[in-house]
Amino acid sequence: MKIAHIDLGKYPILLAPMEDVTDPAFRLMCKKFGADMVYTEFVSSDALIRAVSKAAQKLSISDEERPVAIQIYGKDTETMVEAAKIVEEAQPDILDINFGCPEIGRAHV
């Protein structure tokens, strides 16, 4: 399986982005035990452009984790574009865009 220029083998094992789970220590452990590619925790595009420190910390990656992906999520196109520019500075191998997060309002409560 290939994603862009990254060859992950025939049956790759991918670590999904999980809030408060896929921190650097967990990602390195997963790589040690055979993950072909890992994700950081998913990151809110709104939090990134507002420079929320917890969001920025999620962009920290090391060479030992590669290939590594960062997923940003949001609903506003302009915000996602600005967040993607911020993520580019972290130099992930893959930038995963998630526009699928629904907005829950009072009608759904």
What label would you give each PLM region?
Residues 107-109:
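Conserved small/polar residues in nucleotide/adenosyl-binding loops
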